[in-house]
Design a protein with these regions (language model features):
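Short amphipathic alpha-helix used as the core "switch/output" element in two-component signaling
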Residues: 44, 66-77
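Active-site beta3 strand of CheY-like receiver
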Residues: 6, 49-55
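Two-component/phosphorelay signaling modules centered on CheY-like receiver
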Residues: 13-34
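Active-site residues of response regulator receiver
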Residues: 10, 57
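Interdomain helical linkers/hinges and coiled-coil/dimerization scaffolds
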Residues: 97, 103, 109-153
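Short hydrophobic/Thr-rich beta-strand motif most characteristic of the beta2 strand and flanking loop
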Residues: 27-37, 45, 93
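Acidic catalytic/metal-coordinating carboxylates
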Residues: 38-41, 64-67, 85
Length: 158
């Protein structure tokens, strides 16, 4: 099965590299497909790369992580968002809950904690993928049944 695509967003290149190197992404069922150093660039990459997951910092220039999350929720409802930050502020956490963020983590990122988060997220993504597949199967079935009904004669002659 295909790996789920992840976009990393942080204005600190070292943070992106640390996250990229801390995990065995492939083993967890994910692949890092790109990174951006602010929310504006992240939106451009989201449009082009269509990630399943965006992992973003909050404090960044031009567009912060919460603004990015708002934009993603508006235009890309299927993308799951994980926020990490160095700021332990209640208002950020409250806004993250309001935006239905998948997970809110404090820096420095603990690889075990992020790994567990991604395992839970993979189960969610697998379930979503399975539901979409089931819907397609049902649509195919109902289309076939509808077609069959359309081709039957409306009047039987004896």
């Amino acid at each position: 099965m295909d790996k789920y695509k992840v976009l990393l967003v942080d204005d600190e290149e070292e943070a992106i590299e640390a996250i990229r190197l801390k995990l065995e992404w492939e083993t967890l069922g994910f692949e890092v497909i790109g990174s951006a150093n602010n929310g504006v660039k992240a939106l451009e990459l989201v449009e082009r790369l269509q990630p399943d997951v965006v992992i973003t910092d909050i404090k960044m220039p031009y567009m912060d992580g919460l603004e990015l999350a708002r934009a993603l929720n508006e235009d890309y409802q299927n993308i799951h968002i994980i926020i990490f930050t160095g700021f332990d502020e209640f208002e950020y956490a409250k806004e993250a809950v309001h935006l239905e963020i998948e997970e809110y983590m404090l820096k420095p990122i603990n690889s075990q904690e992020l790994s567990e988060c991604l395992k839970r997220l993979k189960k969610t993504l697998d379930n979503e993928r399975e539901e979409k597949l089931n819907v397609k199967k049902l649509e195919h079935y109902f289309n076939a049944v509808s077609y069959t009904h359309l081709t039957l004669p409306t009047k039987l002659e004896v």
